[in-house]
Structure formats: structure tokens, C-alpha cells
Design a protein with these regions (language model features):
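Conserved Class I S-adenosyl-L-methionine
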Residues: 304-315, 326-330, 433-461
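A short acidic, Gly/Pro-enriched loop at the edge of an enzyme's catalytic core
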Residues: 229, 377-391
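Bacterial N-terminal signal peptides
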Residues: 12-23
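Class I S-adenosyl-L-methionine-dependent methyltransferase module
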Residues: 35, 39-186, 228, 240-372, ...
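A short glycine-rich, Lys/Arg-flanked "PGG" loop and its adjoining helix->strand segment in the class I
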Residues: 271, 406-418
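Conserved beta-strand signature within the Rossmann-like core of class I S-adenosyl-L-methionine
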Residues: 418-427
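Conserved alpha-helix/loop element of class I SAM-dependent methyltransferases that forms part
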Residues: 207-233, 259-262
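A short SAM/SAH-binding and catalytic strip from SAM-dependent methyltransferases
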Residues: 388-403
Length: 462
């Protein structure tokens, strides 16, 4: 018994040392730096007429003005992450099913909030139920994160008056989200790829962009743009953290990140990469996302798999081709990176959600390294043999305006090897110079009435 205990302790020590070495190596190799003025100047010159006054104090951009502006903007964007987390809390109020039996507040009901006594009554009851749930002694992971957000904002749940204040805050956020959604719809009429440029940056995610990535990679292979075994290093911008996502999410499962492992799975299934040898980095400015991935890596070093609930909400409005294609993707997802496991049962109140689950192998989880980096204003300097074959960003650039998107396009391009690609489901402006050129567009029709189509774009590094 004693020798078994010693062996166990030695194994634990080796695992900790391995994790420390992995983390130290990653930290040394991946230190984000703000873009120098020399790199930003060509982009700034392309937008000279519309630049903020503080960037061109004498009519032209200056290095000193840039250095101050870029750091101020980075701080502002990180504040928008916290605003996005407030939206996650509001989506928990709208769509959660673990703490209430009241109907969910979908977008149709959300638009009526404040104008319909029926919806107002639902919102009031859901808020009472959520506040009551947040005061419970043993909270699940998602609830704990939302309670921590409230405390970070200065709220308490200790007394009845404290709880009244939290209720007022939650309902005010519900009204704000209603107005944000309406404004976003109006902005999308002008440019749908910048529809969220004035709202909090959400970390929520779902599987649908991962299916579009799968289709686009197939298209690239058909066009001869990608060869078998050609992908070794990948970066994902804003991998997301799925917990009550804004469209059809719920709260009966813990927060999880799916895109890194869905991408590895697709690359392996298509023969483009070896899941046990490739490297994948995530670039995110959300501490929730980064800490979540760091914890997954620590647990993987100790031999624990990463469990993902593969949630989907098929719609009767989907075209037959989209429905059959997505379901085939959904049923295969995870076979290259892990194995099926027992899913969390879907509550009756969320019966529109389908679920299956996988355990991702620890060896695959260890291939993922999170980096705290704002790709609009920061980058890492990479030697040629460490540049990326693919950088992927979905549902992220929609939170930025044209100048920010152009800075990101040029910035990301410097981290991609010649012949590599940036993939995104948002068309990026080509007004400013970059070393990325438009390459391929994939159209994915989803519905016909009303017409709805997803797109994926690839940009080739010259």
C-alpha cells in the first residue's frame, strides 16, 4: 500500500512539473505586444479622414498619439467584455430552466418586454426565481460565475433590500438588452458584419459556426487550397464559452468551450492534421475563457478528459440540405478527438434542445494553449517556423468597426505563414493594406423563407 501511495505521489509531481514546463514555455514564446506605430501607420493613413481627433493632433497620426490611443482602446474593449458578461447574466434570466418553471423569454417575447403585461409578468416571476436561486448555498459552476459577476459589480444578496436591488438591476438589463437587439437589427441593415460594434462583447458560442468551418475547409480542399497533412499550427480568435447563449442556450450544463475541439476534430477527420501532434492556440481577452481553458489543461495533465455537451436546436425552418448536413456533422463530431459519453438529460422546459456528449482525450486537450491577447491591437512576434497555418475567428469581428477590423486583418496576417489562411464568417474590409488577400467564399443557405445564408471567407497570406 505504501509503495502504491509513493508511486501516486511521484506521478502527481511529474504531472505538475510537466504542466509548469508547458506553461513556462508557452509564456516565454507567446508574449503579446501592442502594435508599433510603424505597423499601424499604413492602416491609419487609409482612414485618415475618419480617424478620431486624438489620433491626429496635428492633422496626421503620430507615434505618441497612437501609443496612448491603442492602450486606451484596449482598456475600453476589455470593459466591453464585462458588459458582454452582463448579457450572459441577462440570457440566464431569459432562457434558464434550472431555477424556474416560467416560460422562456425568446426574442419575440423580449421585444414585447415593457409593452406587454403578459411578458412583464413572466419577467417579474423569472427574476424573483433567479434571485432566490442565487442565494442558495450550493450553486453550480454557471450560477457561481454569475453570482461572482454581481459581486464584482458591487451587488449583494444578503438582505431583502439587497435582493430588491439585484432584481431592479436584472430587469434594467433586460430592458437594455431589448433596446440593444433592436438597435443591432437596424445597424445590420447598413453592415451586418459590424452590427454589434456598439454593444458588449459576448463570449457565448454554439456549434453552427463550427459546421460552417467544416464545409468551408472541404471547399478549400476541393479547390486545391489545402493539402492532406498540411495543418500543424492553428489559432482561434475568441473561442467562446458556451453557457445560455443568446439564441437558444440554457443553463442545465456547465460552461464549456467547444470550438477548439470541434476544429481539431474536423481537421483530423478531413486528413488535414494529426490531433496528437498539431498545436492550437486561443486568443481571447476574457479572463473567464482563459481561466476555463487553463483549468482544462491542468486537469488534462493529470489525466482527466474534457467533457463537452454537444447541444443543437434543429429548426423546422431549416432547408432539407442544411438540416441533413448539420445533423451528419453533429453525429460525427468528437469521434477523432475522444469518445461518446452519457449526456446531461435535457429538461422538459428546454425540449427544443438536442444533446449528445463526448469526452475529449487529455492528450488532445493538452494541444490547446490559451493566450490573453487582443488581436485588434496586439500580436506575438513569431519565427517563420512558428507562424500559423490557419487562424480562425467566427462571430468576433462583428463587434468592431471598419478601422478595428482593418487593424485586425493586418495584424493577424503578420502571424500567418506565407500560403496560410485566415478564416472568418465576417467579411473584412480591404480598404487598408495588409498581406492578406481575398481567397475563397463559401455560401451556406439555411432557410428560404425568410432567406438566411451563412458565409465563410478565407484570406490568403501572400
Amino acid at each position: 500500500m505504501k509503495s502504491a501511495s509513493v508511486i501516486k505521489n511521484i506521478f502527481s509531481l511529474v504531472a505538475l512539473l510537466l504542466l509548469h514546463c508547458l506553461a513556462s514555455t508557452a509564456a516565454r514564446a507567446q508574449t503579446p505586444q501592442f502594435i508599433p506605430f510603424s505597423a499601424a501607420q499604413p492602416i491609419l493613413n487609409a482612414y485618415l479622414g475618419s480617424l478620431p481627433a486624438e489620433l491626429k493632433p496635428g492633422g496626421q497620426p503620430t507615434a505618441a498619439a497612437w501609443d496612448k490611443w491603442v492602450r486606451d482602446q484596449d482598456k475600453d474593449i476589455r470593459v466591453r467584455i464585462e458588459q458582454g458578461e452582463e448579457n450572459t447574466l441577462t440570457n440566464l434570466l431569459r432562457l434558464g430552466v434550472t431555477y424556474t418553471k416560467e416560460p422562456r423569454i425568446d426574442y419575440e417575447y423580449l421585444a414585447k418586454y415593457g409593452h406587454s403585461s403578459f411578458v412583464d409578468n413572466i419577467a417579474d416571476k423569472r427574476t424573483n426565481d433567479l434571485v432566490r436561486a442565487l442565494t442558495a448555498p450550493h450553486l453550480n459552476e454557471g450560477m457561481l460565475e454569475m453570482k461572482a459577476l454581481l459581486e464584482k459589480k458591487g451587488y449583494s444578496l444578503k438582505t431583502p433590500d439587497d435582493q430588491k436591488n439585484v432584481k431592479a438591476y436584472l430587469l434594467a438589463n433586460l430592458a437594455r438588452l431589448r433596446d440593444d437587439v433592436d438597435r443591432d437589427r437596424q445597424q445590420a441593415k447598413n453592415n451586418k458584419y459590424q452590427a454589434f460594434k456598439d454593444r458588449g462583447i459576448s463570449t457565448d458560442s454554439n456549434l453552427y459556426p463550427d459546421y460552417t468551418i467544416d464545409l468551408h475547409l472541404r471547399h478549400m480542399m476541393q479547390e486545391g487550397l489545402l493539402k492532406p497533412g498540411s495543418i500543424h499550427r492553428v489559432a482561434i480568435v475568441g473561442p467562446g464559452l458556451d453557457f445560455v447563449n443568446k439564441k437558444s442556450g440554457s443553463d442545465f450544463y456547465p460552461p464549456q468551450t467547444t470550438q477548439p475541439f470541434a476544429v481539431i476534430d474536423t481537421l483530423a477527420r478531413l486528413g488535414l492534421a494529426d490531433p496528437e501532434k498539431m498545436e492550437l492556440y486561443t486568443f481571447d481577452i476574457s479572463s473567464r475563457v482563459n481561466k476555463h481553458l487553463e483549468r482544462a489543461r491542468r486537469e488534462a495533465v493529470a489525466g482527466k478528459p474534457y467533457t463537452i455537451q454537444l447541444l443543437a436546436s434543429p429548426s423546422d425552418g431549416w432547408s432539407k440540405s442544411y438540416l441533413s448536413g448539420f445533423l451528419e456533422f453533429w453525429q460525427k463530431l468528437g469521434k477523432e478527438v475522444g469518445k461518446s459519453t452519457t449526456p446531461i438529460p435535457v429538461p422538459d422546459e428546454a425540449s427544443d434542445i438536442w444533446n449528445r456528449a463526448i469526452n475529449v482525450r487529455p492528450s488532445v486537450v493538452r494541444r490547446v494553449t490559451p493566450i490573453d491577447m487582443n488581436v485588434v491591437f496586439q500580436s506575438v512576434t513569431l519565427p517563420s517556423d512558428k507562424q500559423f497555418d490557419l487562424v480562425i475567428g467566427t462571430n468576433i469581428f462583428v463587434y468592431y468597426d471598419s478601422l478595428d477590423q482593418s487593424l485586425a486583418r493586418a495584424n493577424i496576417g503578420r502571424m500567418i505563414r506565407p500560403g496560410g489562411f485566415l478564416l472568418t464568417n465576417e467579411a473584412l474590409p480591404n480598404k487598408a493594406p495588409s498581406n492578406l488577400v481575398d481567397s475563397l467564399k463559401t455560401s451556406v443557405p439555411i432557410t428560404s423563407d425568410p432567406p438566411l445564408t451563412d458565409y465563410m471567407y478565407s484570406y490568403l497570406r501572400k
